[in-house]
Amino acid sequence: MLETGQSGKLLYRQVAELVHSRGVEKIIGVGEEIRTAAARFEIEKYFFRTTEELLESDLLAGLRNEVILVKGSRAFHFDRISDRLELKVHETILEINLNALVDNLNYYRSKLKPETKMVCMVKASAYGAGSYEIAKTLQDHRVDYLAVAVADEGSDLRKAGITCSIMIMNPELTAFKTMFDYKLEPEVYSFHLLNELIKAAEKEGVTNFPIHIKLDTGMHRLGFAPEEIPELIDRLKKQTAVIPRSVFSHLVGSDGAQFDSFTRRQIEMFEAASECLQEAFQHKILRHICNTAGIERYPGAQFDMVRLGIGLYGIDPFTNQIINNVSTLKTTILQIHEVPKEETVGYSRKGHLERDSRIAAIPIGYADGLNRRLGNGHAYCLVNGQKAPYVGNICMDVCMIDVTDIDCKEGDKAIIFGDDLPVTVLSEILETIPYEILTSVSNRVKRVITRINEKKNERKRHEKDEHTLLLRIFRKLLKIDSYETYILPFVMSLFLGVVICPENE
């Protein structure tokens, strides 16, 4: 765990209290110091002096139907534990690196004025990464708001223990009671929605419920038109059920230089309309229009708050390059066949072989989110760092890859996307956006949460930006913003069945 400056006795007392309060059923500890605190853990528990001792035991082989969080410094080589577990089950997993996510958060924070607040998007299961684990990490790093699409996403986070303010971007008319009960703040984009919300709040006896007013400045998807602001103000003034907490709009093309003039017009329109709304009320109404690309390209449009989306998950929407990779989709080779020249592979005999080949089957298919258009040699995965093209049609649960020129064996890993094969490569092949690929990874693919400390994919141009780098160092030295350490970073889920942790890092 992160260095806290506390004594081991006090620290592990706090660890034990949190483990017990979160319903963790089993703990596996590695290291001498945590072994001395064994009596504090009144649950099923196992302790080992070293990682090697744990690996040599039969404990990991006996784990069944359990959600496992592996947390530890690189000195403990806990990646060997993850490798052992993956090999045991031969499963396809989406590995989420929380340290990379925090690095991305800090990168964009370094672009902001100190007083600028931040909304972090965790809708669509945090872009496929897993809502709770991401939300908990962001809450620990003191973001101002989380944003989800629908009320059920927000209530699930509340039930899991998330206390941070939550914004609902697509509120349903049938979910107002849920929003009131769980303090979920809805976006309001039309008079119909506003009137129904006021009616529901008055029925429940709710007053001054915070809402977020959306303005349409050019997206033409949802939002009040600027000319509707006077009528909106009049409606809001005549009731006490709801109160505007923020007003915002959505930039259409902030990631494209060809749209710069349109983006500037949007910003000007928003500034004028939001000022009109603010002047009608005595309390402060937060204003926000910048998304990820806007943070980077329009620093003068930060207003009071910004919304961080795809950049949080490691993708720069302006350059389509990786900042720090967060998500790695990987699987293992199930079987390798020696297939003669002129034979075919897969359904409809689409995979025609022009040479004697070694064909490997891996347990991932279109039901897991692997797009069928990647088959028949249109894309590849990585096996032991080398390109292995997809052969034939991608099946529902399995696909085949050509490993003829690769030194590999059954049980070896295959990387679908990750550090060395960015998801942006696949999105370009498919002529789509990385969002679609990330959110298409199905729920049956297990999410494994890690905290890998190596910053392998730190953006080079970021390191060359002297001002940004100095600002990050300054903040780190003063331990402000999200650079503060926190005591118990490794208990990441209310639903954990097993926690594996070391002594102090």
Residues of each region from the PLM?
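Residue-level signal for inorganic ion chemistry
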Residues: 27, 70, 157, 247, ...
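Active-site-proximal beta-alpha core segment in soluble small-molecule metabolic enzymes
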Residues: 93-95, 102, 116-288, 302
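Active-site anion/phosphate-binding pocket segments in diverse small-molecule metabolic enzymes
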Residues: 95-97, 102, 110, 117, ...
